[in-house]
Structures are given as C-alpha cells and as structure tokens.
Amino acid sequence: MGHFDFERFNGFARQSLDDLLFSDLWDYDIFNERDMHSSAYFYIRDYFRKHERDSAYVRCEPQLAGMRPDIVIYERGRPTYVLEFKFFSKPDYINEDAIYDDLDKLADCVDAYDSIKWGFFHLIYDAEIPFTLSDSRLRRAGFSKISVTSINARRKEGTDRRRNNYDEWRGEFDKMQELHRKHA
C-alpha cells in the first residue's frame, strides 16, 4: 500500500476527473448537478480502489465545519480533500454568486481542518464566452489551496475552439433533458 501520493491525486482531481466528467456529459450520463456528483463519486472511489488505498474513503455531503461539501475524501479518518460541483445546463448562463458560495464553503473547510490538503471545484457550463478562474485570481480573492476546473460544453478549454458536433449534441441533450423533467 505504501505512502499516499498526494501529488498524484491532485493531478487526477485537476485533469483526469475533469476529462471523465466531460465524457459522461458528452455521452448523456450527466443532466444535472446530482448526476455530476454521482459520476465524480464513482470515479474517485475507483481511483482509490485501483491504487489500493484502503485507508482512504469517500463520502457524499458529510457534515464538515458546519457545512455539507459535495464530496469529502478522508485518509485514516481525517478529511484530506473537499470537492464542490456546479452544473449550469442552460446555455449562456452562469450564476457567479453560486460559484463563489461554493468557493467560500471550500475555503472555510480548508481553514477549519489542517488535514485538508486541497479543495477542488468543478464547473460544467455551456457558453460562447469561456468562464475561468485562474490560480492567481483565486489567491488574490483569498482562496488558497483551492483549484478550479471548468468544462465548457460548447468550447474547448485552452484553444477556445467550438467542439465538433456541438449543435447535434446540444439538440439531443435538450431533448433528453426535457423527457427527464417529467420524472424530476
């Protein structure tokens, strides 16, 4: 089992988890924030299972520092990572107040527990104009030890190119989401 490799998990949380969540979105497995939590929970548990980390466990919405973060990862009973998720399915809509509420929650958890190494915030949205929060912007706003990754369903991060087959995907996504609404 060996020593826990925090840097490896940080890389997973910042890159691989983001890619996996995008795949689930694009494959019509994520339609709302709860679906996003469920997918992330599965992939995080699978990550620890593959790395034989019996002392690490994952919980959804536990009570922590008077709040309920979406996901908390514990190592030997101590909170080590906290994760928050936001999902905005409506095109060209982002609620920045809701984003900053979650960032505040992460910051409060990080401040309350010395054992917490990082807080991770994952955002899925669909917009023509990319929404980003750089590490330097986060630090200036007082958010240290917090990483933000975002998935724009319409445009690729970095290149800002429109995704191939976006219009077809969006049409199907809207159709399927409308069908699900009667069961919500």
Please report, for each region that a protein language model flagged, where it lies by residue:
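Residue-level preference for long, well-ordered alpha-helices that form the structural scaffold
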Residues: 2-5, 9, 95-98
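Short catalytic/ligand-binding loop motif for oxyanion handling, primarily in non-cytosolic enzymes
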Residues: 37, 91-92, 128-132
